Amino acid sequence: MFLTAVLLRGRIPGRQWIGKHRRPRTVSFQAKESMIRRLEVEAENHYWLSMPYMTAEQECGHAAERRAQAFEAIKAAATSKFPKHRYIADQLDHLNISKKWS
């Protein structure tokens, strides 16, 4: 039993690249460099986003007119797909040739 434990000591059970007891992957130089580059980009984004271009008072309602125009354009595009209204008076207007009975 002790001999079996000694001989099978370093074995990864099951599939060696997936699972709970998997073999750890070595970190390459390229992976380190790409991670550093990604963290630098994230830090720069955080820096620029931490300083807003407009104050909260300026930002409040600055795009209301543009948003209203965009909504009107969307509404007009949606209503243009529908056919025009049809009225019964227009449909039966050809029957009003003569009104001798009235």
UniProtKB/Swiss-Prot annotation:
Entry keywords, A to Z: Mitochondrion, Ribonucleoprotein, Ribosomal protein
Localization (cell): Mitochondrion
GO biological process, any: mitochondrial translation
InterPro entries the UniProt entry points to: Ribosomal_mL63 (IPR016576)
GO MF annotation, one: structural constituent of ribosome
Predominant place of localization: mitochondrion
Gene Ontology annotations for the cellular component aspect, listed alphabetically: mitochondrial inner membrane; mitochondrial large ribosomal subunit; mitochondrial ribosome; mitochondrion
UniProt miscellaneous comment: Identified only in the intact 55S subunit. It is unknown whether it belongs to the 28S or to the 39S subunit. May localize at the subunit interface and dissociate from the 55S mitoribosome during subunit separation.
Similarity field: Belongs to the mitochondrion-specific ribosomal protein mL63 family.
Protein name in the entry: Large ribosomal subunit protein mL63
Organism of provenance: Mus musculus
